[in-house]
């Protein structure tokens, strides 16, 4: 039995913690909110984030990070990008007080606002190597709402430490949740962030009344942009065509369960970005990621017309119809060109 602390009791953190608990592991789910911990422990529910789910009897929640982390083999951080540094600082202090080293994992898909750093870079800066034996990422096509219902799901666990990725693989895998491993931490994180941009565009197309043809064209042409930027930044090309890349792109770009897709849907229906954000009441990671990747495209001299169009809609108030018209009116090219 492996001891695992999951930091963050949102929908995805709860779903991953519940999966590991159902697999027979000692799982402690940390939350900022004491009332949420009480609900999870007493009612075996998390109604704010997974209203229809009944959680494992083996899942224990706490608002005390030291209780969650003590003697753990793995700490899995599953908080929004904007909260990663704050939680990482608290985790570093907790590990120092406990004088304890763990395998550090995360399942957050995004880039830091302002610095555009990947999650692993943020965690590495805040948590000394003394307290982390390895750093890995969980990515791939996985909506929490489906995982908690035991829908068939496959994810990828990326990192250079094979012992660490294989341990987390064993902790999470069962008959309905299958984890694979890869060695490309950078690519796994980068592609997980990039697909959020595409999901906004895909949702916007549906909101405007376009059909599957338009969505398929968007997703396929976006793959070309993702490939070019990924290679420029040091990702492995094969990762793009695996679960962390195209797998995540498909599920996020086609499913109403995706908050980025829903954000795009609202924009396509004529709502402002502020209205969409207020209506959802949740973090839309793709909005910040769009600005980051637009800046990356200029820094690495990669032409990314779809990303540029979505950036102009989000940040320059360019009408969606005009952005689409500009994309469709570009000079005709070979399919392998941007």
Swiss-Prot record:
Top EC group: oxidoreductase
Reaction equation(s) it catalyzes: sn-glycerol 3-phosphate + NAD(+) = dihydroxyacetone phosphate + NADH + H(+); sn-glycerol 3-phosphate + NADP(+) = dihydroxyacetone phosphate + NADPH + H(+)
One GO BP: carbohydrate metabolic process
Location relative to the cell: Cytoplasm
Pfam family, one: NAD_Gly3P_dh_N
Residues where sn-glycerol 3-phosphate binds: 109, 140, 142, 195, 248, 258-260
GO molecular function: glycerol-3-phosphate dehydrogenase [NAD(P)+] activity; NAD binding
Entry GO CC: cytosol
Active-site residues, as the UniProt record annotates them: 195 (proton acceptor)
Metabolic or biological pathway, per its Swiss-Prot or TrEMBL entry: Membrane lipid metabolism; glycerophospholipid metabolism
Intrachain S-S bonds: none
HAMAP family the UniProt entry points to: NAD_Glyc3P_dehydrog
Similarity comment text for this entry: Belongs to the NAD-dependent glycerol-3-phosphate dehydrogenase family.
Function statement: Catalyzes the reduction of the glycolytic intermediate dihydroxyacetone phosphate (DHAP) to sn-glycerol 3-phosphate (G3P), the key precursor for phospholipid synthesis.
Protein name, as recorded: Glycerol-3-phosphate dehydrogenase [NAD(P)+]
